[in-house]
Curated annotation (Swiss-Prot):
HAMAP family: Ala_tRNA_synth_B. It comes from Clostridium botulinum (strain Okra / Type B1). SUPFAM superfamilies: Class II aaRS and biotin synthetases (SSF55681), Putative anticodon-binding domain of alanyl-tRNA synthetase (AlaRS) (SSF101353), ThrRS/AlaRS common domain (SSF55186), Translation proteins (SSF50447). It is found in: Cytoplasm. PANTHER family: ALANINE--TRNA LIGASE, CYTOPLASMIC, ALANYL-TRNA SYNTHETASE. Gene3D superfamilies: 2.40.30.130, 3.10.310.40, 3.30.54.20, 6.10.250.550, Bira Bifunctional Protein, Domain 2, Threonyl-trna Synthetase, Chain A, domain 2. This is Alanine--tRNA ligase. Zn(2+) binds at H566, H570, C668, H672. PROSITE patterns: AA_TRNA_LIGASE_II_ALA (PS50860). Binds 1 zinc ion per subunit.
Length: 879
């Protein structure tokens, strides 16, 4: 057995199965497509599920891949052990109803003994206890020693996940110090002790488990194998852990260089070194696939990994941002197999650095708060931090709850997770997050995805708006039907169509389907998971049946408006790259007949001057009346010509390229104008941030742009009429009015302050004494926060010793302020606690220091009641 690098192992595996007539596919994105059950791709076969389930036709019956994967289920163990990691690559070869056991078993043995040259006396094989077929092949079609084959039960060697396809599996293992093993019991014991490690699982999907628990034979059994690349590398490089594998150790060595720490000298430091080494790999690949840090979904997973790694950097004494520098090491070791890493290197580093800087801004304040919480919990002899406090750290200071848990665990404290989840649920109800858009209709198990794969629905709508066809499928009430009649709503599928189905951000077409005996309105048009075009219809007249000849006609005016907006989006994209920078990448878009929306990567607001320049460039390209051309070409040729591809899309070998003159060139399957002049006019309506590092521009074109400009002009005219000036004088007139208003406001505030000062004597005359502490409290009217604090200062200074609590009803909101002298604080008075109790009654909250605090409230009607509680609260605090 010769030492082999990780990248070499990957290439040898893929080459081997290419030699067995397999199609080599590049790794799919970590972001699952059309699978809402997964947050991130976590297994080699996960992106191939539609092929196994028959929902899509595979590009070849034999496929081989090396799939990047992220798993965070046992993240708390990453770093603490040298075995666990979040990022890994899974090599696999797959058969979709083609070859089966008699092919894969000999191939597997050939690869590991002849290509990898693993010593046969170090290999063990396990099979399912009832799988005599697999045993026969292992014994008679390979030269494995039969004594090294063990039969194991369902728990170890049978793959199933609920109902549906399942089957036995055969695993191949390597002896890493067990010595000779003679029985299955000895084998299991050695495996549990990691003296024997499994490195390749061959799954024979040959059954379909039904609801009664029966295992029915599949007509076309499948093969699904998985070999962990990093684990295989530990064997080929004769190292004990993944952190000693060549490509991963390069990252670990850089962590040690940046921190000045030596690996394997300090157990605590080793944990931090391993966490950073592992997490930066996941972080780099996740960002390269278009994921950005956020507080939801996969973005939260990324933020959690990034901030956990950053925190452990500080534990190692690394003071400045550093993770973005580690990205270079990851990319240098991976870019040959993942060229997108090199293409997006600077973007990935910028996202990481920005998130590190944001975390740096909050971590010190957050750690101070957390340390205060820890002291409070320990002083009260408690072992649990309340959920609302953990949520505050998460919501205000950006601390992932798992990071808070990790820090608390070091102090022997846990979190009230139920309380935290309650706070999280309430926040989500207050601000419901946007649902992720999908490119197909419905979930995988809907009837829309059960349409016969042999039915083709050819799209002819690039150059036709009306075609003749036959009805291939009718669906109504979640059932396949032979026909529909007037008043029914459902789905019609035809063999060809001019209707564009919603895809790539472009909304679906509408129109009509008709013949002499029926007419249906097409309300929407989408695709199912296998790409069939679904016409969502309402039958307006007559009846329609399967195989009826029909005419399909797209709403031409609506389609033309969509075309204008889609082509304008391409020009906008190119203009943004020119003005804002070449780091701009599309992260989402929406195009309909009224407007366009474009989301793109950028790390700050686009300035007004930049927006004006972008708008000017887009309109200039429109006025040039550039020809818009489409051409189908090889993906590599398209890239060589500089065509822009979507961030995380996987493309076929041949792609459609849309060019607008020499200004814009993008891979796109949408519909476009034939000449940029047809767009007419372009106007930006808004620019805003929608997520960390993502900006959104909304714009209108053609007549909608004219309407927008007319509306703005009408507002200017009306404003000029109100101010009794012409439009040229409007700004000067407005500035003059604003200055006058500010002067009046100052006069009003001065009068209010004078009135408040008049209330000072009355408040001082009503001081009470509670347990030796003087208390002044009152509700005053129409005083803002500054005036309220000034009044509080005067009363406290007059009292010389005591506590003052004031409340004000100002512009429909309640304001509170509390102040205390040092001697009363020494007696137990705490303004932060007082103000919190008082403000709660008025529907608000707040806090502060022992000697000064302020708060707000929502219910002015409760102001008097809130002030009345001051004495009771003070009494409870004074020692």
């Amino acid at each position: 057995m010769e030492r082999m690098g990780l990248n070499e192992i990957r290439e040898e595996y893929l080459k081997f199965f290419e030699s067995k007539a397999h199609l080599r596919l590049p790794s799919f994105s970590l972001v699952p497509k059309n699978d809402k059950s997964l947050l991130l791709i976590n297994a080699g076969m996960a992106p191939l599920k539609p092929y196994f389930t028959g929902l899509q036709v595979p590009p070849n019956k034999r496929v081989t891949t090396c799939q990047k994967c992220v798993r965070t289920g046992d993240i708390e163990n990453v770093g603490k052990t040298s075995r666990h990691g979040t990022f890994f690559e899974m090599m696999g070869n797959f058969s979709f109803g083609d070859y089966f056991k008699k092919e894969i078993i000999p191939w597997a043995w050939e690869f590991i003994t002849e290509i990898l040259k693993l010593p046969k006396d170090k290999l063990y094989v396990t099979i399912y206890e009832d799988d005599d077929e697999a045993l026969d092949i292992w014994v008679n079609k390979t030269d494995v020693d039969p004594k090294r084959i063990f039969r194991l039960g369902k728990e170890d060697n049978f793959w199933e996940h609920g109902l549906g396809p399942c089957g036995p599996c055969s695993e191949i293992h390597f002896d890493r110090g067990a010595g000779e093993v003679k029985t299955s019991e000895e084998f299991v014991k050695a495996s549990d002790e990691d003296k024997i490690v499994e490195f390749w699982n061959l799954v024979f999907t040959q059954f379909d488990k039904d609801e009664e628990g029966n295992y029915n034979k599949l007509a076309n059994p499948n093969i699904d194998t998985g070999m962990g690349l990093e684990r295989m590398a530990t064997i080929m490089q004769n190292v004990d852990t993944i952190f000693e594998v060549d490509t991963i150790k390069a990252v670990l060595d850089k962590v040690c260089e940046l921190s000045g720490a030596n690996y394997k000298e300090d157990r605590v430091k080793d944990i931090s070194i391993r966490i950073i080494t592992d997490h930066i790999r996941s972080i780099t690949f996740m960002i390269s696939d278009g994921i950005l840090p956020s507080n939801e979904g996969r973005g939260y997973v990324l933020r959690r990994l990034l901030r956990r790694a950053a925190r452990h950097g500080k534990t190692l004494g690394i003071k400045n941002t550093f993770l973005h520098n580690l990205t270079d090491i990851v990319i240098e070791n991976c870019y040959k197999n993942y060229p997108e890493l090199e293409e997006k290197r600077e973007y990935i580093k910028k996202v990481i650095k920005l998130e590190e800087e944001r975390f740096d801004e909050t971590i010190d304040a957050g750690m101070q708060i957390l340390n205060d919480y820890i002291k409070e919990v320990k002083n009260n002899n408690h072992k649990v931090l309340s959920g609302d406090k953990a949520f505050k750290l998460y919501d205000t200071y950006g601390f992932p709850v798992e990071l808070t848990e990790e820090i608390l665990e070091e102090e022997g404290i846990s979190i009230d997770k139920e309380g935290f989840n309650k706070e999280m649920k309430e926040q989500r109800e207050r601000a419901r997050s946007a649902r992720e858009e999908t490119n197909y209709m419905g979930s995988e198990d809907t009837i829309l995805n059960k349409i016969d794969l042999n039915i083709n629905t050819d799209f002819e709508g690039y150059d036709k708006l009306e075609v003749k066809s036959k009805v291939a499928v009718i669906i109504k009430d979640e059932e396949f039907k032979n026909g529909m009649e007037k008043g029914n709503e459902g789905v019609i599928v035809t063999y060809n169509t001019p209707f564009y189905a919603e895809m790539g951000g472009q909304i679906g077409d509408t129109g009509i389907i008709y013949n002499d005996s029926f007419k249906a309105e097409v309300i929407d048009c989408k695709k199912n998971i296998s790409g069939k075009v679904l016409h969502f219809v309402k039958i307006l007249d007559g009846k329609v049946a399967l195989e009826d000849q029909v005419i399909l006609k797209v709403n031409e005016e609506r389609r033309n408006n969509i075309r204008k907006n889609h082509t304008a989006t391409h020009i906008l994209h190119a203009a943004l790259i020119k003005v804002v920078g070449d780091h701009v990448q599309q992260s989402g878009s929406y195009v309909d007949d009224e407007r366009l929306r474009f989301d793109f990567s950028h790390f700050e607001a686009v300035s007004e001057d930049e927006l004006k320049e972008v708008e000017k460039i887009v309109n200039k390209e429109i006025m040039k009346a550039n020809a818009v051309n489409t051409k189908v070409m090889n993906i590599e040729e398209a890239k060589e010509q500089g065509a822009i591809a979507l961030f995380d899309n996987k493309y076929k070998d041949d792609v459609r390229v849309v060019s607008v003159g020499n200004f814009s060139k993008e891979l796109c399957g949408g519909t476009h104008v034939s000449n940029s002049g047809q767009i007419g006019m372009f106007k930006i309506v808004s620019e805003a941030g929608v997520a960390a590092g993502i900006r959104r521009i909304e714009a209108v074109t053609a007549f909608k742009a004219m309407e927008y400009v007319d509306h703005k002009n009408n507002i200017l005219k009306e404003a000029a009429q109100i101010l009794k000036c012409n439009e040229k004088e409007l700004l000067n007139k407005l500035n003059h009015q604003v200055l006058e208003m500010k002067e009046k406001e100052k006069e009003i505030e001065a009068l209010k302050l004078k009135l408040a000062s008049g209330a000072e004597d009355e408040i001082l005359n009503n001081i009470r004494e509670i347990k030796g502490v003087k208390v002044a409290s009152a509700a005053v009217k129409d005083i803002d926060g500054n005036a309220l604090r000034d009044l509080g200062d005067k009363i406290r200074d007059n009292m010389q010793s005591g506590v003052v609590v004031l409340g004000s009803n100002y512009k429909g909101k309640v304001l509170f302020v509390a102040m205390a002298t040092k001697d009363t604080v020494a007696k137990g008075v705490h303004c932060g606690k007082i103000i919190k109790e008082v403000a709660t009654i008025a529907g608000g909250g707040g806090g502060g220091r022992p000697d000064m605090a302020q708060a707000g409230g929502k219910d002015p009607n409760k102001l008097e009641d809130a002030i009345k509680t001051v004495e009771t609260v003070v009494e409870s605090l004074v020692k």
